[in-house]
């Protein structure tokens, strides 16, 4: 079934949970789509898990477009949402609409996601008015890592929790079709979810959100050096990959690979002409 922003909105009313994962290339996106994932996010998290940076701030709009194109080619049914990276919507309303439009027109995304609350309402309204669906993002917003002093849980005081709820209402009023809640206490995420009519997608925000999203490298266990508290690893793909690569190297070194079944032949009569 084709997933649209209406699918997301209906899911909340029907009590159906929404599943999302990040993806950055054709092959992974194709596998996810074949598993009937509801939505795929081309996240600026690619700065960390693809480029190896310590945060997301260096990611450019052109990089998001590049990876969105790749994901688009592997997807038939999932809703494709592209992140608007740092400074792609902060400088002016015109920049925000232009860059959101590029993600749709050049990248092939179905919607865009941007971080922030009351400070980005005008951007959300303008992008929505340009007929571009918007997903909001509240709580631990990685583009604000320097302001937060690191990747820390948000909304863990009555004052900040109240602000989260108010921001969620403002984002809904501005026309967003859903909101990501990241790094928020479970009870507060539940309060936010119950205060708005659009779905919330949680990442480190507990069980009561309308859906969940994870970075696929985290949930597949590709990196063993650090596992965020909110991540459940459904596999240890990193270990499987290492074992496979080691076996490949061993077989190349010992001459066990390639075998005859992996090789091509030439007609003997043609071969004789070369001698």
UniProtKB/Swiss-Prot annotation:
It is an enzyme of class 2 (transferase). Its cofactor is Mg(2+). GO terms for cellular component: cytoplasm. Pfam families: Pantoate_transf. InterPro entries: Pantoate_hydroxy_MeTrfase, Pyrv/PenolPyrv_kinase-like_dom, Pyrv_kinase-like_dom_sf. GO terms for molecular function: 3-methyl-2-oxobutanoate hydroxymethyltransferase activity; magnesium ion binding. Its main location: cytoplasm. It catalyses: 3-methyl-2-oxobutanoate + (6R)-5,10-methylene-5,6,7,8-tetrahydrofolate + H2O = 2-dehydropantoate + (6S)-5,6,7,8-tetrahydrofolate. It is found in: Cytoplasm. Its EC number is 2.1.2.11. Pathway: Cofactor biosynthesis; (R)-pantothenate biosynthesis; (R)-pantoate from 3-methyl-2-oxobutanoate: step 1/2. Coiled coil: none annotated. Disulfide bonds: none annotated. Belongs to the PanB family. Homodecamer; pentamer of dimers. NCBIfam families: panB (TIGR00222), PRK00311.1 (NF001452). This is 3-methyl-2-oxobutanoate hydroxymethyltransferase. It comes from Clostridioides difficile (strain 630) (Peptoclostridium difficile). The gene is panB.
